[in-house]
UniProtKB/Swiss-Prot annotation:
UniProt-listed Enzyme Commission number(s): 5.3.1.6
Record-linked NCBIfam families: PRK05571.1, rpiB, rpiB_lacA_lacB
Activity-regulation annotation: Inhibited by iodoacetate and glucose 6-phosphate.
GO molecular function annotation: D-allose 6-phosphate isomerase activity; ribose-5-phosphate isomerase activity
InterPro entries: RpiB, RpiB_LacA_LacB, RpiB_LacA_LacB_sf, SPI_LacAB/RpiB
Single GO biological process annotation from the record: D-allose catabolic process
Source species: Escherichia coli (strain K12)
Influence of temperature on activity: After incubation at 45 degrees Celsius for 30 minutes RpiB retains 65% of its original activities. At 60 degrees Celsius RpiB is rapidly inactivated.
Protein's name in the database: Ribose-5-phosphate isomerase B
Gene: rpiB
Active site: 66, 99
Length: 149
């Protein structure tokens, strides 16, 4: 992924800056969807901004941070075409791309520290969707999404 939308709430604000710097060092273009301060805010807004950018093709994928990664990933998954995963270790991040074709990664700043967050991001960005036997399952998820909408 060459272009990423990034969003967080106030809890993820400090970690976001560190991860954005890490991404830029790797040559990834980052579109910052907020928040831009540590003042209290609500994560659904930032999940929405990132999900819309991903679903609309503005970016290749998205990264979200809140306290645990759970709430912000739930909000992102409400958008058609979004397959957001919350990860607290690199192996799940890698497999989520390889097997589930995830396009949004979420994690919690209260759960992972900076070095682990970098490892999770690197594993996710470094993995490619394998298709094959996994394609049928991804298509089944998309069919559920289409029936719901």
């Amino acid at each position: 992924m060459k272009k990423i939308a990034f969003g967080c709430d106030h809890v993820g604000f400090i970690l976001k800056h560190e991860i954005v710097a890490h991404l830029v060092e790797r040559g990834v273009e980052v579109i910052d969807k907020g928040t831009w301060s540590s003042e209290r805010t609500d994560y659904p807004h930032y999940a929405s901004q990132v999900a819309l950018a991903v679903a609309g093709g503005e970016v290749d994928g998205g990264i979200l941070i809140c306290g645990t990664g759970v709430g912000i990933s739930i909000a992102a998954n409400k958008f058609a075409g979004i397959r957001a995963v919350v990860c607290s270790e690199p192996y799940s991040a890698q497999l989520s791309r390889q097997h589930n074709d995830t396009n949004v990664l979420a994690f919690g700043s209260r759960v992972v520290g900076l070095e682990l967050a970098k490892m999770i991001v690197d594993a996710w960005l470094g993995a490619q969707y394998e298709g094959g036997r996994h394609q049928q399952r991804v298509e089944a998820i998309t069919a559920i999404e289409q029936r719901r909408n």
